């Protein structure tokens, strides 16, 4: 597909045919084609045996209706109305090698034209086309003026140097290319972004290498501004987007998206509710205003200066970006690995990377502060609804809704953390978290060798993940979820699916002085295929009270269940005089494997065990008896054919069979010894046949 940046056309008198012939010229960096080249082109045209029909609409003349096809040319010095054009693009869109179509000269006017498959309308300098509909692969090449053009279903408009398109509407799969020196004003874009935000799609929508002004981008619409392009006063609604490689000025995002790529520049963008401005590495923006529920994202290597962040506006960035501006605290800055006075709310997030730092950070409702290991954040204020993401290798200190908190990245000790709303903290090996509160959508993760002290409180919707043996010297209060995990067995992680039988599984222990259940759950792994191994909860010297649900995932062979022996599989171990209340634990869901059901039992030693039931699962005898019962029924059905009453006539016969009875088998030794299980059933059938 050829879309040359500068193609111009002129009429030349052909003395051989005695007619005007259209000649195209390309303005390239090396200059125009020579007159010899034009002459050769005309000579080639005159050598065609059958010449296309050319008509000329003279100045002052008006032509109403008509169709152009088969490489016909219509040269318009006067005016036309209601023409249909279906020729001129047989050799590809906007190619100078094409012949045929409608040519609107200086002073010529074409109105209400329909350009359809393979059709081409060429509007030369000084010519005007109005109310044109271009569809099904037709195109309009513009060096003059086009007003109120509609592009439908692969309809294309090419605005060349000196050309002006105003009021163009680009519908599904339509395409407008504004080339260097071209101008498009008042364009409405309804296509180009069907593949998703910032997707690789340059075959529909508006491509700007020249200038686009006062553009409206609706849902599914896209405007791409190339490096030579400028877009001014663009309005983008939800579901529409703008890709900036050149310059975008005075853009308003009413739920729409603006993506500023490397070497792109956007100035004076206003981000309203639902809108995003994304500044990628090497991109730059200036004087952006973030209003409530709007969002500015600045990637590492991106730059945003003179930003105005109003209340409820979100800033998403990291200490590898450059951002300066004002917020409700005053002046703020991010750059050179340091952040100061940043406000995070309503989806905002600041990532403090290794070796970088942040100070005076306000994490308000919906905001997130993430501090990597080796990063440092001081004077942090986290209000209710704010989130902190860190591990014991980070250094963080400040206040939250519960009071003062701190993380010492050197010692690995943390105190007074409040984790909620997507916040998380990881206690690495050798680290310690004391007096931790995990709220709704908060996560506390402990590596092997991590430990807890004081009171660890898990609210409803909170999670604690154990990746190894963990010891708590204090109390655990659980209204959320505690999950034993195994980083080497993704099959069993998070999803609680049954792990592959050959997956390596390492079982872990959680040891705590006291456990108070508040309707929370502990998710444990168990092998029911004979190894009798399980994760284990150890109550050391204290007590287990309240109500805790135990949920087990069988990580052994899911088809093989083995009867337990002795006391069963110990899952709760009360040590050093610890006690467990009757009813402190219960199964959250049935546990089955192979032929067995398993139950949770408390023994006199205060420990809790999984045991297989003496009776097989109800499905086992049913499955074992199905074959015998089916064979009995088949024999009965076959024998029934001998018990029929019939009526015969010369041309037809009717047969009726009615039968009922009882089928059953006595217990003759039990299915454990291979016998058919005891079963009993009745049957009845009526069969009517005719031919």
Identify the residue ranges that each predicted region occupies.
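Short loop/turn motifs at secondary-structure junctions and domain boundaries
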Residues: 2-5, 531
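Outer membrane beta-barrel translocator domains of Type V secretion systems
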Residues: 613-691
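Short N-terminal segments immediately surrounding and downstream of signal-peptide cleavage
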Residues: 54-71
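Fold-core signature of tandem repeat domains
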Residues: 63, 74, 80-85, 102-104, ...
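Gram-negative bacterial Sec-dependent N-terminal signal peptides
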Residues: 4-5, 9-51
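Extracellular beta-solenoid/beta-roll
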Residues: 186-188, 251, 324-327, 360, ...
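Intrinsically disordered, low-complexity Ser/Thr- and acidic-rich flexible linkers and loops
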Residues: 92-96, 192-202, 491-499
